[in-house]
């Protein structure tokens, strides 16, 4: 699998599909609640025969507005993700207002023209002069600001962590099965000494930003940043795609390879990294009072870290445990036995395997 620009675009599109579905779902739910309120309380309509037409308009607006805003968010992410937060807020506010106004006018203009047997332009004028237009516009703008505000707050936490806290998950320690991948930047001390603290900080920021799409595509949770090391995590379920988990590492490699000229021009160094992947039973729970956080405890993390630490000695970039190797059935990857090692505090050895992309050039 040779991850080209084509593959990077596919990754971005698939990431945005998730956003599109989420926004459309939120707006559809709001639309249903609004329609139900109209039906039972008659806020704007008194004739219940108008309920179905209203529901049709609400659903159409939800789909078109949701899709348009999600596409805009994808563009915003690509072009402005490193810009100041205030600039992004202003762009969102102006763009959302324009998108919402456009679809309100188009959908209701068409409906009024059909319902009153008038032209589309007359239907638009009729709708703009109604009290419903201003109420709909303000309500929808506030709704989208709330949705994206919650999404922005959620981005400050790990994937799904805010919802887990709200639902009360893991407030009591619980044993679950989880995958962990430790990814460590090579020669970070040397690079930091050569670049200095500020430029090395920018180097790390660009590196973490550039590998984000691969992480998102693989469905990983960023468990922790530890200086120049990043720890990724995946829940183990019946639907776990282990090939997609492995692909995260190779997508990250290819993303950096495609931008190596930019890194060389800007910093004189290109990020290189090694990774160790392992999985198994861990204990998960919320901890802390001043700062609440979900933590994972168990030998699985220590073993994954040890596997990553052996990459240099074994002369390879990506090592996985036998636990992972036994679950990979696709010939997309070549997995060869590398060595046995004894995790810290353990007596029994575990087998580790090097992973190579079988279809790369």
Feature names for model-found ranges:
Residues 313-361:
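Cytosolic regulatory/linker segments at or just downstream of nucleotide-handling modules
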Residues 5, 115-176:
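Regulatory cytosolic signal-relay segments
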Residues 16, 36-49, 59-87, 102, ...:
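Juxtamembrane segments at transmembrane-helix boundaries
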Residues 1-58:
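Membrane-anchoring hydrophobic segments
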Residues 68-77, 85-131:
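Hydrophobic transmembrane alpha-helices
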Residues 46-60, 89, 122-135:
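Membrane-interface segments at the starts/ends of alpha-helical transmembrane spans
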Residues 173-247:
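Catalytic NTP-binding/metal-coordinating core of nucleotidyl cyclase/transferase enzymes
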Residues 218-244, 260-299:
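Catalytic core of nucleotidyl cyclases, primarily class III adenylyl/guanylyl cyclases
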């Amino acid at each position: 699998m040779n991850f080209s620009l084509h593959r990077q675009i596919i990754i971005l599109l698939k990431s945005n599909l998730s956003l599109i579905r989420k926004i459309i779902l939120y707006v559809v739910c709001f639309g249903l609640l609004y329609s139900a309120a109209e039906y039972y309380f008659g806020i704007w309509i008194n004739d219940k025969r108008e309920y179905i037409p209203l529901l049709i308009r609400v659903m159409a607006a939800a789909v078109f507005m949701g899709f348009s805003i999600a596409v805009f968010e994808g563009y915003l992410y690509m072009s402005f993700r490193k810009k100041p937060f205030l600039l992004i807020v202003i762009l969102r506010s102006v763009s959302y207002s324009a998108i919402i106004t456009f679809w309100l006018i188009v959908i209701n203009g068409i409906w009024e023209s059909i319902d009153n047997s008038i032209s589309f332009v007359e239907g638009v004028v009729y709708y703009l002069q109604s009290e419903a237009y201003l109420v709909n516009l303000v309500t929808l703008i506030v709704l989208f600001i709330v949705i994206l505000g919650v999404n922005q707050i959620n981005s400050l936490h790990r994937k799904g962590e805010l919802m887990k806290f709200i639902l009360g998950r893991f407030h009591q320690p619980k044993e679950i099965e989880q995958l962990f991948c430790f990814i460590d930047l090579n020669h970070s001390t040397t690079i930091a000494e050569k670049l200095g603290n500020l430029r090395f900080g920018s180097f790390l920021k660009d590196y973490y930003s550039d590998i984000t799409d691969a992480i998102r595509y693989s469905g990983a949770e960023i468990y922790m940043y530890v200086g120049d090391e990043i720890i990724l995590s995946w829940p183990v379920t019946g639907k776990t795609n282990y090939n997609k988990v492995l692909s995260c590492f190779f997508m990250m490699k290819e993303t950096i390879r495609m931008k190596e000229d930019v890194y060389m021009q800007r910093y004189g160094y290109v990020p290189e990294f090694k990774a160790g992947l392992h999985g198994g039973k861990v204990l998960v729970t919320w901890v802390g009072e001043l700062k609440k956080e979900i933590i994972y405890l168990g030998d699985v993390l220590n073993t994954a870290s040890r596997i990553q630490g052996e990459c240099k000695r074994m002369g390879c970039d990506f090592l996985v445990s036998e636990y992972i190797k036994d679950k990979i059935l696709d010939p997309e990857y070549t997995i060869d036995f590398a060595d046995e090692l004894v995790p810290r505090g353990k007596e029994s050895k575990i087998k580790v395997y090097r992973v190579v992309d079988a279809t790369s050039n």
